[in-house]
Design a protein with these regions (language model features):
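Peripheral, non-catalytic segments flanking oxidoreductase cores
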Residues: 1-100
């Protein structure tokens, strides 16, 4: 999946497919899975604090509200869960520090 995403990023940037392949032949980690369960009984409790993702990219499947992003004006805004064309939960891909 990671290699396919790198190919898609390369094409989106106007680079040849496979451009990133020599740079990601031996990554330090293949996949790290983290689950932050939603607790409807808790209101307005901060989860993980403000941070950037250090990896190349992060795949998010957010099915509950709570995710926020810092916009260009340095204001935190909601990033509500998204759905695909079929109305199903969709993945969001955040660009991390290493790819930025």
């Amino acid at each position: 999946l990671g290699h396919r995403l790198f190919d898609a990023f390369a094409l989106a940037l106007g680079l040849p497919e496979g451009y990133f392949k020599p740079m990601v032949t031996c990554p330090p980690a293949k996949l790290r899975l983290i689950h932050y369960p939603f607790d409807a009984s808790v209101e307005d409790v901060p989860g993980i604090g403000a941070h950037t993702d250090y990896e190349c990219f992060t795949l998010l499947l957010a099915d509950q509200p709570g995710l926020e992003v810092l916009n260009e004006e340095s204001v935190w805004i909601d990033a509500p869960p998204v759905k695909n064309a079929a109305g199903e939960e969709a993945f969001v891909i955040n660009i991390g520090d290493m790819l930025e």
